[in-house]
């Protein structure tokens, strides 16, 4: 059976990337150069590049070209409920947390909906960026009920809020409902993160509950899409 030309080109470039011919952050030849190299049409090359992007080999960035992605991504457990400090200890990489906003706020309409909060509830708002190996690649936006977390400081936010909640307040964090989506970057993402031209983020929304089933935290965790993969373990029921 005849194989489409674009699939042949896709496989050839994918093998080159896997073999180290093209390394992470390098830019592939232009569509014009690839058209000449493979003796084919520009549309065929575009189909091959689209397939490479779909399978995580490259990211097409406007004004820059097709950038090879780092396929050795950091793994985030989907089913687990861990703090960034706990995760950082398993990554074996240099990390730093920067607190950009911290304080008590009346809940916005969105947070009222996400936390099932009333307008007169006091809500802690904490916005932090996470720096890994020299790049700010995660933006965490956390919202906690003050009635559950009566005291919070910037120093606690720089270290570990979960460590404080469980160790100092004696609360038992039990489970979370998670939603994972891809969304366009916001102005806030562009301001606080090192996006390197990427225009989409992987967004994880967490609704976190205490042992007594009280919803006490809503988190929006925004990840640069080339840096992470989210993994889970599944077992078939019988």
Swiss-Prot record:
Gene3D superfamilies tied to this protein: Chorismate lyase-like, Winged helix-like DNA-binding domain superfamily/Winged helix DNA-binding domain
SMART domains (UniProt xref): HTH_GNTR, UTRA
DNA-binding region, residue range(s): 31-50
GO molecular function, one term: DNA binding
Keyword Repressor carried by entry: yes
All copies of domain HTH gntR-type, residue ranges: 1-71
Function: Repressor for the trePA operon. It is able to bind trehalose-6-phosphate.
UniProt-listed PANTHER family: HTH-TYPE TRANSCRIPTIONAL REGULATOR TRER, MANNOSYL-D-GLYCERATE TRANSPORT/METABOLISM SYSTEM REPRESSOR MNGR-RELATED
Name assigned to this protein: HTH-type transcriptional regulator TreR
Lineage: Bacteria, Bacillati, Bacillota, Bacilli, Bacillales
């Amino acid at each position: 059976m005849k194989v489409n030309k674009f699939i042949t080109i896709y496989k050839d470039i994918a093998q080159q990337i896997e073999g180290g011919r093209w390394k992470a952050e390098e830019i592939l030849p232009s569509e014009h150069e690839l058209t000449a190299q493979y003796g084919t049409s520009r549309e065929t090359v575009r189909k091959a590049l689209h397939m490479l992007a779909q399978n995580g080999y490259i990211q097409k960035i406007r004004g820059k070209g097709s950038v090879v992605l780092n396929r050795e991504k950091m793994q985030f457990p989907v089913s687990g409920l861990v703090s960034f400090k706990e995760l950082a200890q398993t990554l074996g990489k240099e990390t730093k947390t920067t607190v950009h906003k911290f304080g008590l706020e009346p809940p916005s309409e969105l947070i009222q909906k996400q936390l099932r909060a009333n307008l007169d509830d006091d809500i802690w708002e904490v916005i932090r960026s996470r720096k890994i190996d020299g790049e700010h690649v995660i933006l965490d936006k956390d919202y906690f009920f003050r009635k559950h977390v009566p005291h919070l400081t910037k120093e606690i936010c720089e270290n570990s809020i979960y460590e404080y909640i469980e160790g100092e307040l004696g609360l038992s964090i039990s489970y979370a409902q998670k939603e994972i989506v891809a969304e366009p970057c916001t102005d806030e993402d562009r301001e606080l993160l090192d996006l390197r031209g990427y225009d989409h983020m992987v967004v994880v929304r967490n609704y976190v509950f205490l042992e007594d089933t009280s919803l006490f935290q809503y988190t929006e965790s925004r990840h640069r899409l080339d840096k992470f993969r989210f993994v889970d373990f599944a077992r078939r029921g019988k």
